[in-house]
Amino acid sequence: FKLKSDDKVVICAGLYFMRKGIDDFIKVAEQMPDVRFIWFGDTNKWVIPHKVRRLVEHDHPENVTFAGYIKGDVFEGAMSGSDAFFFPSREETEGIVVLEALASHQRVVLRDIPVYKGWLDDKSATFASDVPGFVKALRQVLADKTSTREAGYHVAESRSIDKVAHELVQVYEKVME
C-alpha cells in the first residue's frame, strides 16, 4: 500500500454498492486529503452500476485505494493496525464487519442507522449521519479524542459465537427442564 510510518490510515470493508456508502467514503476522503483511505472488498465490476464502477476505477482522490478482496494476515493487520475503521453503510442486516473491527480493538466510525441500536452506543462507537459529521468524527478519532476501543471490544466479546452458543445452550436446558 506504500504507506509511511506517520500516515493516518482509515479503512473500510465491503462490497462496491451505494448502499454501503462508497460514495460518502470518497466524499469524506476528498475532504481529508492528509489521510489515507483504503477500501477492502470486491464486487464483479460488470454487475455494479456504472456510477459505482467509475468511482472505483478512477473517480476518486489519490488518497483512496481500492485494495480488492484480501484475507488472512494482511487483512487482519490492516484491521488492527489502521487508525480507524469507517463504515458509512446506509443499510445492514447485522454488521458483521463492524464486529470484526471491534474485535480487533479498532475505533469505529459508523453511519447512525437502526441496526446498531441496542448493541452499540457512543461508548463503543462514534456515529454520524452525513459527510460533514463523518469528517468531524474521524478528525476526533484520529486526534485520539475518543476512547471507544475497550468498550467496543467488550461488545464484540459479548456477541462472539462461543458466548452466543453458551447462552443458547442455557436457554435450551431451561426449556427442557
Descriptions of predicted regions:
Residues 4-20, 26-30, 38:
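Conserved donor-binding/catalytic core segment of Leloir-type glycosyltransferases
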Residues 50-70:
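Nucleotide-activated donor-binding/catalytic signature segment of Leloir-type glycosyltransferases, i.e.
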Residues 69-70, 77-82:
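Short alpha-helical donor nucleotide-sugar binding micro-motif in glycosyltransferases
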Residues 90:
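Aromatic "clamp/platform" in nucleotide-sugar-dependent glycosyltransferases that forms part
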Residues 103, 107-110:
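Short hydrophobic beta-strand element within catalytic cores of glycosyltransferases
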Residues 122-132, 140-145:
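Conserved acidic donor-binding segment of nucleotide-sugar-dependent glycosyltransferases
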Residues 146-173:
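A charged, aromatic-enriched C-terminal amphipathic alpha-helix characteristic of glycosyltransferases
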